[in-house]
Amino acid sequence: MSHHWGYGKHNGPEHWHKDFPIANGERQSPIDIDTNAAKHDPSLKPLRVCYEHPISRRIINNGHSFNVEFDDSHDKTVLKEGPLEGTYRLIQFHFHWGSSDGQGSEHTVNKKKYAAELHLVHWNTKYGDFGKAVKHPDGLAVLGIFLKIGSATPGLQKVVDTLSSIKTKGKSVDFTDFDPRGLLPESLDYWTYPGSLTTPPLLECVTWIVLKEPITVSSEQMLKFRNLNFNKEAEPEEPMVDNWRPTQPLKGRQVKASFV
């Protein structure tokens, strides 16, 4: 059954609960990170981002965002330690962004919104594949990185330059030899909490790891994101903007910080 969810007035986040009742669940994402309430947990290990041998495959406009997909048939591109037990393989990354530079991120920090947010999606190898992993509360680890307006990040440029060839829903092109390490900030200090996918089916299977330090993106780079379309090629044009879910109630969850 194909649910036509999106980000518009009639199919946007406030409607998702009708088809996906877990939208009102106990561990939904994103959230606002209140830095005063987030407790430093000295037992949290430093995050190990082992992206030495990434094999990127293609980039695709899925009508909600665009995904850069990776070969996840081996442990060459993994996330481990930090709050995680075991090894999590990178399967894809995507972004959420706004119609203007003042909004676009899904998570917020003390209610502050960033221009965009990068999600690097990893699945727990103990479950064998992504489809099985999402059925478990510790199935996924998503590394969230804020983008703030500033100088252009060189590591983003190869992505940005490809967007014009995947303007509409369903379009994809080969996208090889991309190094996701170019998307990481210098510091890997993070906040972590148990949460969910931020798009339907909104499954509560994610250990969120949100980095404190943003990367920068230029206004020119952001404009290229906004040139994408939600629609398929022959359909009326709908600019792909504001593809973010608003923050959800914390419902008693504790956000932990890896830093003082």
Curated annotation (Swiss-Prot):
UniProt site (Fine-tunes the proton-transfer properties of H-64): Y7, N62, N67
Catalytic activity: hydrogencarbonate + H(+) = CO2 + H2O; urea = cyanamide + H2O
EC number(s) recorded for this UniProt protein: 4.2.1.1, 4.2.1.69
Binding site for Zn(2+): H94, H96, H119
Keyword Phosphoprotein: yes
Listed InterPro entries: CA_dom, CA_dom_sf, Carbonic_anhydrase_a-class, Carbonic_anhydrase_a-class_CS
Localization of this protein: Cytoplasm; Cell membrane
UniProtKB keywords: Acetylation, Cell membrane, Cytoplasm, Lyase, Membrane, Metal-binding, Phosphoprotein, Zinc
Modified-residue entries (Phosphoserine), positions: S2, S165, S172
Name of a matching Pfam family: Carb_anhydrase
Alpha-carbonic anhydrase domain residues: 3-259
Activity-regulation annotation: Inhibited by acetazolamide.
Active-site residue list: H64 (proton donor/acceptor)
GO cellular component: apical part of cell; cytoplasm; plasma membrane
Cofactor(s) this protein cannot do without: Zn(2+)
Molecular-function GO terms, alphabetical: carbonate dehydratase activity; cyanamide hydratase activity; zinc ion binding
UniProt-annotated binding residues for substrate: T198, T199
GO biological process, one term: carbon dioxide transport
Phosphoprotein recorded as keyword: yes
Modified residues (N-acetylserine): S2
Record's subunit section: Interacts with SLC4A4 and SLC26A6. Interaction with SLC4A7 regulates SLC4A7 transporter activity.
Free-text function comment from the UniProt entry: Catalyzes the reversible hydration of carbon dioxide. Can also hydrate cyanamide to urea. Involved in the regulation of fluid secretion into the anterior chamber of the eye. Essential for bone resorption and osteoclast differentiation. Contributes to intracellular pH regulation in the duodenal upper villous epithelium during proton-coupled peptide absorption. Stimulates the chloride-bicarbonate exchange activity of SLC26A6.
PANTHER family found in the cross-reference section: CARBONIC ANHYDRASE, CARBONIC ANHYDRASE 2
Family: Belongs to the alpha-carbonic anhydrase family.
Protein name per UniProt: Carbonic anhydrase 2
Organism: Oryctolagus cuniculus
